Amino acid sequence: LTQALCEKLEGRGKVAVLVGTPGAPCHEERALGVRSVIEQHPGMEIVELEYDEDTVEKAYAYTKQLLERHPDLAGIVCCNMSNPVGAARAVIEAGRQGQVVIVGMDHDQEALGYLRDGTIYALGVQDCYSIGFDTVQVAVMIADGVLPGEAYPEKTQETTTIVYQNGAADMLRTLYGVID
């Protein structure tokens, strides 16, 4: 996702990062990934990183503050499911659609609506079925006494699909039955 943002911004601009819960492994790993990608683009800078504790309201409030403190903010990377919604609401309220590029995680219905209308540039949609299936499968193995590394990896890699505006309607239809 961050690479998509960098390409959209042509490797230039100030970027903010919204993260969910401090210490949540997947949120922290995503934030580290954002940093590592941004570091590869000398014309880009992370100006702030904020934790919204997985609330749309805090993501919205932080984004409003970010837009006020950084009127030249070019992009926002959102590391969890609530960030993109809060960021999009604040960007719309500030009249900055098309000026601030938002990328984010997950498939919240409201976020997909913002993707469809172009407020959000791209979303990373996780394969929730596989995540659930793998979790139950590993839980059964653990209950049967199987140790990590024997029949299953200690950590699994799940699929994330990057969805852009042209794929938003299909994703809304598939996940939520929304038909335009």
Describe each region flagged by the PLM.
Residues L18-P22, C26, V37, S130-D180:
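Hinge/cleft segment of the Venus flytrap/periplasmic-binding protein
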